[in-house]
C-alpha cells in the first residue's frame, strides 16, 4: 500500500508520477499497513465469512477496458482455496491518497516477481502479477489473524447503529476559478459531437467532450450555490458492535483523517469505510487534507473536492462524537 502523490522540491505534487526526477523530494502521504478483519461463524462455530478492511483502492489494473474486481478477485480466490466458499465482504478504508503500486524500486519489484512467479510473470504481465501478489499478502494476513482471533468467538453482541446527516464545509470556488470555468465551458460548448467515423473513436471523443462540459458546468453551479449553501450534507453511519466500530463516509478520504478518527476512538478497533454512501456526481469525490490542498495535485483540485480540509476535520469531529456516544451507551 503506497503513496499516490509525490512532491518535488518546488513543492508541487504529481499523482503517480515518475520519482526518478532530480526535483523529487518525498511522498505526500505515508502508508497504512493495517488490515482490519471481522470473522463470522455459524452455530457450529464453523467459519462462514469475514469483513476485510484494507486502506487501499482496488485499482491495480488501469487503462484497460473490461469489468473487474481488481485484486479483490484474486483475494477471494486465494482465501477460498484454503477456507472453502465462505462469504467475503471487502471494505476500502480511507485511501484517497494511497495506491496499490510502488512509485520507486520498480526494477527490484520486477526482479522479485520474475524470481517468485517465473513464467507466470511473463504470461500475466506486471499489473495482474501485482494483483496476485497483493492477494497473497492479504491472504497471509487473514491466516495469521484467524489463527488467534478465532479463539474469541462471541455468541452475543450489543449492536448500536446511528445515522446522522452531518454538515461539512464546502471547498469554495473563487472568483478567478469561476471565471476560468465559464471560459472553459463556453469553449467546450462551441465544439460539436462527432456523428461519423469509427464508432469506438466516436464514443471515446464524445465522452471526453461530455465530461469536459460537465466538469466546467459543475464548477459554475457550485459557485452560484455556495453563498446560500456553504455546507455539504453527508449521511454518516456509525455502528458499534461490542468493542468494534464501523464509521462510513462517501469520499475518497485522505489517510490522515482515518488516523485522527482511529486514534481518538474509544473502541478497540474502528473500521473506517470510504466510498460508502451517495453515488453519482454528488458522491465519491476526494477529500484532501490541508497538506494535500497546498500540494495542488489533481486530487486536491477544484474539480475533485466538494468538501474542504476544514470540512474533513468536521467529519472527524462528528465521527468521533458519535463513536464516544455509542461507546458510552454500551457501558451504561
Task: Pin down the residues of each PLM region.
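Non-catalytic substrate/cofactor recognition surfaces at enzyme active-site rims
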Residues: 1-332
Amino acid at each position: 500500500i503506497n503513496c499516490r502523490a509525490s512532491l518535488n522540491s518546488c513543492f508541487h505534487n504529481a499523482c503517480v508520477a515518475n520519482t526518478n526526477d532530480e526535483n523529487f523530494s518525498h511522498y505526500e502521504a505515508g502508508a497504512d499497513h493495517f488490515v482490519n478483519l471481522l470473522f463470522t461463524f455459524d452455530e457450529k462455530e464453523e467459519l462462514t465469512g469475514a469483513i476485510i478492511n484494507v486502506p487501499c483502492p482496488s485499482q491495480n489494473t488501469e487503462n484497460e477496458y473490461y469489468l473487474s474486481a481488481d485484486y479483490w478477485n484474486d483475494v477471494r480466490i486465494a482465501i477460498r482455496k484454503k477456507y472453502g466458499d465462505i462469504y467475503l465482504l471487502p471494505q476500502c478504508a480511507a485511501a484517497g491518497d494511497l495506491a496499490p503500486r510502488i512509485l520507486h524500486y520498480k526494477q527490484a519489484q520486477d526482479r522479485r516477481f520474475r524470481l517468485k512467479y517465473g513464467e507466470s510473470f511473463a504470461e500475466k504481465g506486471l499489473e495482474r502479477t501485482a494483483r496476485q501478489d497483493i492477494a497473497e499478502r492479504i491472504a497471509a494476513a487473514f491466516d495469521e489473524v484467524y489463527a488467534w482471533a478465532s479463539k474469541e468467538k462471541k455468541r452475543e453482541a450489543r449492536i448500536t447503529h446511528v445515522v446522522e446527516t452531518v454538515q461539512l464545509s464546502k471547498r469554495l470556488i473563487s472568483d478567478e476559478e469561476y471565471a476560468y470555468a465559464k471560459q472553459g465551458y463556453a469553449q467546450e460548448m462551441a465544439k460539436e459531437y462527432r456523428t461519423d467515423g469509427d464508432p469506438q473513436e466516436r464514443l471515446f471523443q464524445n465522452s471526453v467532450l461530455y465530461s469536459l462540459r460537465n466538469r466546467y458546468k459543475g464548477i459554475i453551479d457550485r459557485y452560484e450555490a455556495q453563498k446560500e449553501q456553504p455546507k455539504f450534507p453527508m449521511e454518516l453511519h456509525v455502528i458499534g458492535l461490542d468493542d468494534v466500530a464501523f464509521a462510513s463516509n462517501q469520499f475518497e478520504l485522505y489517510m490522515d483523517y482515518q488516523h485522527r478518527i482511529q486514534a481518538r476512538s474509544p473502541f478497540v478497533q474502528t473500521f473506517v469505510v470510504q466510498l460508502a454512501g451517495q453515488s453519482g456526481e454528488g458522491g465519491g469525490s476526494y477529500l484532501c487534507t490541508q497538506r494535500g490542498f497546498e500540494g495542488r495535485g489533481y486530487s486536491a483540485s477544484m474539480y475533485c473536492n466538494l468538501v474542504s480540509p476544514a470540512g474533513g476535520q468536521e467529519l472527524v469531529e462528528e465521527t468521533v462524537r458519535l463513536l464516544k456516544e455509542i461507546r458510552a451507551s454500551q457501558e451504561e
